[in-house]
Amino acid sequence: DEVAGNFTRLKFSMEHVGGYHFFREALAVICNNHHRASDPRRVYAGLTSIMPDDNGLPDYWTLSDDELLPLIHQGDDDCAIFGLDFPYKKADYAKALINRIISLDISEEAQEGILGKNLEHALGMD
């Protein structure tokens, strides 16, 4: 939060959204900086490592639907981006992550944002 506040022209992606253990702190940074910045979005939630383990439970770096849905709701549809982390994983893993995002109970607009439009905006390509 302090770094984002001190470097107001820099954009951040908080990969793993703090993971299981620091999720609430990361959510606070995302929301705090969304509401006080002149650019509506400078701190993003990186949603690449979000698959639960084989038992359906989150591990150190993944998030459950109980965390993802409030993140998207509280941070607004433009808070999350996909695809910056884990570029070395296999295609099947990436497909499973995309399908997980598509299966969330969120609007099609939110899905499109997470899967590309929010990153386009962050990079000034829109």
Where do the protein language model's features map onto the residues?
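Mid-to-C-terminal alpha-helical segments outside catalytic/metal-binding sites
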Residues: 74-79, 87-126
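Catalytic pocket-lining loop regions of alpha/beta-barrel enzymes
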Residues: 1-81
